[in-house]
């Protein structure tokens, strides 16, 4: 009897143990997945106020860049609507320091604009037509990003290090984008950020081991609008620009006051200030112009001199879309849709004063000193300016280009004494500006544009982007924009009215479909193996028991086995049949795409000055109240986007 009892209980005991082990394995596996996020955790399934039509493919959320200090950067990524000849990703940064890139996402180059604080409309001329767009709130503490209160960063090299860490982790989440052509774009104080990040990426690529060559990042270009890049020339341009635009008149008391401030600025620059990003005396030149133009309680808008604003805001209430963005980004349903972490304990702010006041960059040299090396490394740079911006005006940009030396020449010098001509640009029959270029550097002046060029001229800015990216729709289809340089069309670019698909896009879809099935097959292998092992063990003991107990009434000994219906395994079969499968066609094991994306036409592997608007430290203050402004050097009366 003892022997029979042993044989009859052993299969049941082992089956019970196996079932418990599988249950524990499933729970532990789920907990591991919960701790380490994957792409589907960032997928934006719906967006409050979205316009009619299919939702654009986007992801959003936080990536940790400083574990010790709980530093996390927030991103919002939009997948391109169409694919040209190859995959491209543009990373957009606003300035400050401390101003959110959601300005760029919702007021400039993103696919949506806010009609009011609860309604989104499509942005004609958005930059996501043929490029993936990645908006990042940085440094830590900016916008939706966060960090422990006492751990804000201070220098540009710290910022660049954090950003490289962000990209390392972001590409782990989204490996299908790691081999895209990579471009950085931004405005204002991003003129400091972007060259530092570019230098850090170039250094990273140089230091990458032979074994890791496949993880080289394909940095292809920089695009900076109204950037704060070279304080020496740009500070001195305030007086010149004020006279040129007739903001002050020579010989008047107002002009004399500005000239005195200008002289004090020159003295500080000559006393060791030329290698600093911030010169306190020079900030007073801009302040003086704003003060002397005050009339009936209003002053010029420092971001668009054609407009006036309440003094001392002088542009901080502009652009008008600002009044919609803050309430929209503080809505609970929007916060949830964008996967904003609970650790972000304060509401979204356009510009964060604590970030600005801590980011003094005292030991950082102006980014203009990095540009020659970047250009000489083969990275093209386009600088563009809105002609009506005062705070980072085009005269200052043109002056530092004229003085800068790189690749054996000075400025736009083609040969000694011969300068590159300015090429007139017309867009749809209107004078749009001009282009000038030499030795990998291009300069574009936008006529009648403000500090935020894409806000004023979205379609023209997209035309500039497509030219810079090398998008040519000749073999794609669609209606080309009537854009001409010196009367010649050149490469055809498309702004709106795009085709439903492109040849490259069809190829990409076929690859994605194949990769999707491959990924599902791969993900199913583990479950199949587990089920096969369980079935084999179960079958073995049933077979052995029957041999030992032939005719002993198997059902009577194990009555509960009949209760293990197919429904008991439904959890394994349906593990992926959750809402995460909404994006099954894209957020599978993305590493399957590493050998698929962009292999047709390119090689793999290697090869605001301050804020628009300002900071609101009081969560309960009215959204329309005056906000603290930010100049590239934290000047109390100016700002930058």
Curated annotation (Swiss-Prot):
Protease with a carboxypeptidase B-like function involved in the C-terminal processing of the lysine and arginine residues from protein precursors. Promotes cell fusion and is involved in the programmed cell death. Residues 594-604 have a biased composition (Basic and acidic residues). The keyword Glycoprotein applies. This is Pheromone-processing carboxypeptidase KEX1. The chain crosses the membrane at residues 523-543. The active site is at residues 188, 389, 451. It is found in: Golgi apparatus, trans-Golgi network membrane. Residues 494-504, 631-641 have a biased composition (Polar residues). GO terms for cellular component: membrane; trans-Golgi network. It holds the Pfam family Peptidase_S10. Its EC number is 3.4.16.6. One of its GO terms (biological process) is apoptotic process. Residues 1-34 form the signal peptide. Residues 544-641 are cytoplasmic. SUPFAM superfamilies: alpha/beta-Hydrolases. The keyword rRNA processing does not apply. Residues 486-506, 593-641 are annotated as: Disordered.
């Amino acid at each position: 009897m003892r022997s029979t009892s042993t044989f009859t209980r052993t299969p049941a005991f082992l089956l019970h143990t196996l079932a418990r082990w599988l249950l524990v394995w499933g729970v532990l596996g789920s907990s591991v997945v919960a701790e380490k996020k994957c792409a589907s955790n960032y997928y934006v399934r719906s967006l409050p106020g979205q316009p009619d039509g299919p939702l654009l493919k986007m992801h959003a959320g936080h990536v940790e860049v400083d574990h010790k200090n709980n530093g996390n950067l927030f991103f919002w990524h939009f997948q391109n609507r169409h694919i040209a000849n190859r995959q491209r990703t543009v990373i957009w940064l606003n300035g400050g320091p401390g101003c959110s890139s959601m300005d760029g996402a919702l007021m400039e180059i993103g696919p949506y604009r806010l009609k009011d604080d609860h309604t989104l409309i499509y942005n004609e001329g958005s930059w996501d037509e043929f490029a993936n767009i990645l908006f990042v709130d940085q440094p830590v503490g900016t916008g939706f990003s966060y960090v422990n209160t006492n751990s804000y960063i201070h220098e540009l090299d710290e910022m660049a290090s954090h950003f490289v860490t962000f990209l390392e982790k972001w590409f782990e989440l989204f490996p299908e984008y790691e081999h895209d052509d990579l471009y950085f774009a931004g405005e204002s104080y991003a003129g400091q950020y972007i060259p530092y990040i570019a230098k850090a990426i170039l250094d990273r690529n140089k230091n990458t081991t032979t074994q890791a060559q496949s993880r080289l990042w394909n940095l292809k270009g920089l695009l900076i609008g109204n950037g704060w890049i070279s304080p020496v020339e740009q500070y001195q341009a305030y007086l010149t620009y004020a006279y040129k635009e007739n903001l002050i008149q020579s010989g008047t008391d107002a002009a004399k006051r500005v000239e005195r401030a200008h002289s004090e600025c020159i003295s500080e620059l000559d006393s060791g200030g030329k290698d600093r990003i911030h010169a306190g005396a020079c900030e007073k030149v801009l302040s003086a112009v704003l003060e002397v133009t005050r009339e009936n309680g209003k002053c010029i808008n420092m971001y668009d001199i054609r407009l006036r604003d309440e003094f001392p805001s002088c542009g901080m209430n502009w652009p008008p879309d600002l009044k919609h963005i803050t309430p929209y980004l503080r809505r609970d349903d929007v916060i949830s849709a964008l996967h904003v972490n609970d650790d972000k304990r304060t509401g979204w702010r356009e510009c964060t004063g604590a970030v600005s006041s801590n980011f003094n960059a005292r030991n950082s040299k102006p980014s203009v000193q990095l540009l020659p090396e970047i250009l000489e490394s083969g990275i093209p740079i386009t600088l563009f300016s809105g002609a009506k911006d005062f705070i980072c005006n085009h005269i200052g940009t043109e002056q530092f280009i004229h003085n800068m030396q790189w690749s054996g020449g000075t400025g736009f010098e083609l040969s000694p004494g011969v300068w590159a001509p300015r090429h007139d640009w017309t867009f749809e029959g209107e004078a749009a500006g001009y282009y000038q270029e030499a030795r990998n550097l291009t300069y574009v002046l936008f006529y009648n544009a403000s500090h935020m060029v894409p806000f004023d001229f979205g379609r023209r800015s997209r035309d500039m982007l497509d030219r810079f990216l090398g998008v040519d729709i000749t073999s794609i289809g669609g209606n080309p924009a009537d854009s001409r340089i010196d009367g010649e069309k050149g490469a055809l670019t498309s702004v709106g009215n795009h085709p439903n698909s492109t040849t490259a896009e069809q190829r990409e879809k076929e690859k994605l479909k194949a990769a999707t099935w491959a990924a599902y097959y791969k993900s199913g292998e583990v479950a199949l193996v587990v089920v096969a092992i369980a079935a084999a063990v179960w079958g073995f003991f049933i077979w052995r028991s029957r041999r030992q107990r032939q005719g002993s009434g198997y059902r009577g000994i194990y009555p509960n086995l009949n209760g293990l219906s197919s429904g008991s395994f439904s959890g394994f079969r349906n593990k992926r049949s959750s809402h995460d499968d909404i994006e099954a066609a894209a957020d599978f094991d993305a590493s399957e795409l590493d050998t698929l994306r962009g292999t047709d036409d390119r090689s793999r592997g290697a090869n605001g000055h301050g804020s628009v608007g300002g900071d609101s430290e009081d969560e309960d203050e009215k959204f329309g109240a005056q906000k603290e402004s930010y100049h590239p050097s934290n000047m109390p009366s100016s700002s930058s986007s």
